[in-house]
């Protein structure tokens, strides 16, 4: 692995120093990103960092709501990765970005499709054709939430 991308919140972790030491040993570059960053990967591939705001972390449920949200773009295709953000972060993202900036072909649904994520307004802004939800079968949390699934289905979104 050549590079690892994290937000500044990673520095909060008690394991951060150990993490840094492993990266140095492996000669892996650590890239700390902030909202508004643009990473050119190849000619037609780039990543836009949508969130977090490293200068103003959300204090509520800090690890989830300050997850990296990034949009990976390749020519006319895009995918929005939302980490574990919840409604509070979604609302901040909606305030700061146009729907065009958030629109993506594929949405990696935030926080495993929990009831605390994927508001109607956020899903409508992203307007995905496909939604991917990372969950374990018969998990103890009841993810994904039925309301989240219904909101995605109303947009005729294929769910995986």
Where are these regions (language model features)?
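Non-globular, low-confidence helical/coil segments that flank catalytic cores
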Residues: 1-160
């Amino acid at each position: 692995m050549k590079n690892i991308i994290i937000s500044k919140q990673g520095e909060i972790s008690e394991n951060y120093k150990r993490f840094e030491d492993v990266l140095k040993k492996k000669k892996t570059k650590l890239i700390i990103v902030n909202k508004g960053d643009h990473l050119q990967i190849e000619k037609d591939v780039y990543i836009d960092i949508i969130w977090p705001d490293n200068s103003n972390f959300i204090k509520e449920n800090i690890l989830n709501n300050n997850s990296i949200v990034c949009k990976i773009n390749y020519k006319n295709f895009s995918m929005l990765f939302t980490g574990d953000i919840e409604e509070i972060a979604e609302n901040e993202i909606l305030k700061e970005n146009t729907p065009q900036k958030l629109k993506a072909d594929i949405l990696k649904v935030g926080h495993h499709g929990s009831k605390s994520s994927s508001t109607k307004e956020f899903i409508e802004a992203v307007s995905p054709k496909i939604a991917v939800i990372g969950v374990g079968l018969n998990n103890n949390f009841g993810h994904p939430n039925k309301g989240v699934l219904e909101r995605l289905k109303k947009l005729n979104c294929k769910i995986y």
